[in-house]
Amino acid sequence: MNFNINILGTGGTRPLHNRYLTSVLIEYHGESILFDCGEATQMSLRKQKISWQKIKMICITHLHADHITGLLGIVMLMAQSGDTRKEPLTIIGPIGIKKYLETNIELLRVHKNYQIIYKEIIINKTEPVLYEDKRKRIEYIKLKHSIDCIGYLFIEKDKPGKFDIQKAESLNIPKGPIRKKLQEGYEVMLNGRKIVPSEILGETKKGLKFAYITDTAYFEELSTYIQNFNLVIIESTFKDDLKEEAKKKLHLTAKLAAQITKKAKVYQTGLIHFSERYTLNKDLYELLNEAQQEYPNGNIFLAKDGMKLKANKDKFIIK
């Protein structure tokens, strides 16, 4: 299955020597989508030997420095790699993302030899579906933070079941375009008879659903957007002893993150966006323990810089 999730960074506020700022990249059928782009994101790409030229889209959650200061570097990197980039780069984010980037491009006289397409989200006005093709769609949800902040949902479409050649031959369906249309899930007319895909296809395979959620305070409706998702990467900035600080700063504790995914019956939960105060493994495992106590059957894990998750049937395997 051609679906990988790469953890480029897991920290909040500022990068540490062993923990870059929160950023996640999806590799899906030969193209990549980057979620957030803090300082040193391009270093993570280099370390993990991920091609920045395959990045088709960059989705920014909000305009705080730890989520956007690496964006200009990525744009410059793509421009300085010769004329190898042919496709435009789509950048999605809240109002202001275009002004932020274009101002920096102008001031630094960056020569970019490819097109940037901006899609600025007006929360509660922009349609939820941001992008869609035959394999997937990307949606946004409103989060609760000190400025406009967006969560992203990556939803793989259901796939038609296995093509039954014997049934196709028994129905005299010729090889070629007609079979292809049926395999893609479309009805066809053949000799005056309508043939539906279910006649020659096996059971439909459910697509995978992934969510990237940071930065946000707890709110009841959040779990409704991620019901039965296969994997949710969600911020877990603080331990429970700092729950009042989390509330004040509009962030989540690991325990609250687990409450959200438990309520949503999420299959796997990855904790991310850890406070810079947690420099020891002991601190991070205390975060993990608090989340696991809240949702014992939640398949909860700590996201780690350099981690790769590979899709395998209805779940993701940590490589």
Swiss-Prot record:
Free-text cofactor note: Binds 2 Zn(2+) ions.
Alphabetized UniProt keyword annotations: Endonuclease, Hydrolase, Metal-binding, Nuclease, tRNA processing, Zinc
Active site: 66 (proton acceptor)
Annotated positions binding Zn(2+) 2: 66-67, 215, 273
Annotated TM spans: none
Keyword check for Zinc: yes
EC main group: hydrolase
UniProt cofactor(s): Zn(2+)
GO molecular function, a single term: zinc ion binding
Annotated EC: 3.1.26.11
Catalytic activity: Endonucleolytic cleavage of RNA, removing extra 3' nucleotides from tRNA precursor, generating 3' termini of tRNAs. A 3'-hydroxy group is left at the tRNA terminus and a 5'-phosphoryl group is left at the trailer molecule
Residues at which Zn(2+) 1 binds: 62, 64, 145, 215
Stated role: Zinc phosphodiesterase, which displays some tRNA 3'-processing endonuclease activity. Probably involved in tRNA maturation, by removing a 3'-trailer from precursor tRNA.
Binding partners and assembly: Homodimer.
HAMAP family for this protein: RNase_Z_BN
Similarity-based family: Belongs to the RNase Z family.
Protein's name in the database: Ribonuclease Z
Organism field: Borrelia duttonii (strain Ly)
